[in-house]
Amino acid sequence: MLKLLLDEHISAGVANGVHRRNRSLVVHSMVQWESGNFLGKEDSVCLLEAAKQRLTLVTYDRRTIPPLLKVWAEEERSHGGVIFVDEKTISPADIGGLVRALISLVDEAGGMDWTNQVYFLRSGH
């Protein structure tokens, strides 16, 4: 089952919007998750705790996360999955667009095991 953790650069409004459209879906904003204790922490620390909680990270960060995932794959370390969003496809300011794309993805693939999955989100999913 897909459970989402939105990175700290994604508006908490996205988590609220996704939750309004699908109340059964677990979705956390990094700001609210674990009382904000992971804000500003290293990516590896956040990914490790997210994996423990079976959360899939949603992020625009295509600079630091991909190299980390490569290292983890080489070390045979598991993560809870990562969904990348491209700002040219869905602007960070387009809260409604990101909500719609995530809901579409959940409707289509929310039941699969997201462990170690990497997905590139498209507009409208």
Predicted regions and their residues:
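TIR-domain catalytic/interaction hotspot
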Residues: 35-51
